[in-house]
Amino acid sequence: MYKLVLIRHGESTWNKENRFTGWVDVDLTEQGRNEAYQAGELLREAGYTFDIAYTSVLKRAIRTLWHVQDRMDLMYLPVVHSWRLNERHYGALSGLNKAETAAKFGDDQVLVWRRSYDTPPPALEPTDERAPFNDPRYAKVPREQLPLTECLKDTVARVLPLWNESIAPAVRSGKQVLIAAHGNSLRALIKYLDGISDSDIVGLNIPNGVPLVYELDEDLKPLKHYYLGDQDAIAKAQAAVAKQGKAG
């Protein structure tokens, strides 16, 4: 049996402001830093250790990983930073308040943009300052692979090459792997691992800063998964994530 630990970054400044974030590189709030540190404490107390970690190239995930490593005394851990673990690109919605957007377009439309499998939000114009083309962190990524908007289907297609080529081989080799990423890049991976249908994925909500443990068989098929921590608090956090895209 193998174990894989996933963690969504702690609360970011735009999580707090209920804004669509996507590839915009916002930082953690004080609460987010505390959530990350507490995640490290939960993992340490439960006896976990790691051989390698994976994260995105966005600071809210990177800093979350730092705090987990710090609390676990694993600052030396090899870390792979990949744009493939970035949050889903929210296109022209990037930076907009979710509730205000729902009030304008309707709860149902915003739910489709946020949680459906194959309907992307309106795309950015290539000349928009939020477009990734001139960002140095993506200088080595072929321009045609850089998105101006994404649906979850696009995010799955982006994440899976990293899983197949790097993460899965690391797990199979016996390494203890930690992934610190984002709500939708983790939803994409979980959809693949658990075989969740396109329609059912809409109901999957991942709370900030809570370790999610997957126990996998020799074929990397899930045997079970569970969150570490107070289960009532986790359920409330998941419900709060689900409400973010509603008008009020």
Curated annotation (Swiss-Prot):
Query: CDD domains per the record?
Result: HP_PGM_like
- Where is the catalytic site? 9, 87
Cite the position(s) of the site with description Transition state stabilizer. Answer: 182
- InterPro entries documented for this protein: His_Pase_superF_clade-1 (IPR013078), His_PPase_superfam (IPR029033), PG/BPGM_mutase_AS (IPR001345), Phosphogly_mut1 (IPR005952)
**A Pfam family matched by this chain, by name?**
His_Phos_1
Its GO biological process terms?
gluconeogenesis; glycolytic process
Q: Keyword Isomerase on this protein? A: yes
Q: In which pathway does it act?
A: Carbohydrate degradation; glycolysis; pyruvate from D-glyceraldehyde 3-phosphate: step 3/5
Enzyme Commission identifier(s): 5.4.2.11
Q: Which UniProt keywords apply?
A: Gluconeogenesis, Glycolysis, Isomerase
Give the GO molecular function terms: phosphoglycerate mutase activity
Q: Which reaction does it catalyse?
A: (2R)-2-phosphoglycerate = (2R)-3-phosphoglycerate
From which domain of life does this come?
Bacteria
- In which residues is substrate bound? 8-15, 21-22, 60, 87-90, 98, 114-115, 183-184
The record's PROSITE patterns line, in alphabetical order, gives: PG_MUTASE
Function of the protein? Catalyzes the interconversion of 2-phosphoglycerate and 3-phosphoglycerate.
Subunit annotation:
Homodimer.
Q: Which family does it belong to?
A: Belongs to the phosphoglycerate mutase family. BPG-dependent PGAM subfamily.
Which PANTHER family does the record match to this protein? PHOSPHOGLYCERATE MUTASE
Q: What is this protein called?
A: 2,3-bisphosphoglycerate-dependent phosphoglycerate mutase
